[in-house]
Amino acid sequence: MNILHICVTSKWFNIDNKIVDHRP
């Protein structure tokens, strides 16, 4: 796994987490 790939995946995961957290 490339560091860049991990960074991008982490960012997407963080966004997904925020969306899920905002959902009731």
UniProtKB/Swiss-Prot annotation:
Changing residue 23 to F: Hypersensitive to L-Trp, stalls 50% of ribosomes at 11 uM L-Trp. More than 20-fold increase in basal expression of tnaCAB operon. Pfam families: Tna_leader (PF08053). GO terms for molecular function: rRNA binding. L-tryptophan binds at residue 12. The keyword RNA-binding applies. Changing residue 23 to H: Hypersensitive to L-Trp, stalls 50% of ribosomes at 107 uM L-Trp. More than 20-fold increase in basal expression of tnCAB operon. Suppresses loss of function of D16E mutation. Keywords: Leader peptide, RNA-binding, rRNA-binding, Tryptophan catabolism. One of its GO terms (biological process) is positive regulation of L-tryptophan metabolic process. InterPro entries: Trp_operon_leader_peptide (IPR012620). In the presence of L-Trp stalls in the ribosomal exit tunnel near the constriction formed by ribosomal proteins uL4 and uL22, where it binds L-Trp, 23S rRNA, and probably contacts uL4 and uL22. Required for tryptophan-regulated expression of the tna operon. In the presence of high levels of L-Trp release of this nascent peptide by release factor 2 (RF2, prfB) is inhibited. The ribosome stalls with Pro-24 in the P site and a UGA stop codon in the A site. This prevents transcription termination factor Rho binding, and thus allows transcription and translation of downstream TnaA and TnaB. This is Tryptophanase operon leader peptide. The lineage of its organism: Bacteria, Pseudomonadati, Pseudomonadota, Gammaproteobacteria, Enterobacterales. The gene is tnaC.
